[in-house]
């Protein structure tokens, strides 16, 4: 089990999940809209197809941040 801080610019929540969970499943289970903005895993931008990989495939074993960052038009 791993601790994932999941959320966006405004709201973040720490959840405990199985490391064999896909990133997409984690986001959907926690109500995070990943269709807008840039997805980051521990500060690194995710690439196409990465959402269907598991935390274990990324080498996450204890804790991480999974965040959707939306930039404002004037930012």
Residue ranges with predicted function:
Residues 1-75:
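Ubiquitin-like/PB1-type beta-grasp interaction modules and other compact soluble beta-rich domains
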């Amino acid at each position: 089990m791993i601790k994932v801080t999941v959320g966006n610019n405004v709201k973040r929540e720490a959840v405990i999940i199985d490391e064999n969970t896909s990133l997409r499943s984690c986001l959907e289970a926690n109500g995070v809209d990943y269709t807008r903005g840039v997805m980051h895993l521990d500060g690194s931008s995710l690439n196409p197809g990465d959402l269907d990989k598991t935390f274990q495939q990324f080498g996450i074993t204890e804790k991480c941040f999974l965040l959707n960052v939306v930039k404002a038009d004037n930012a």
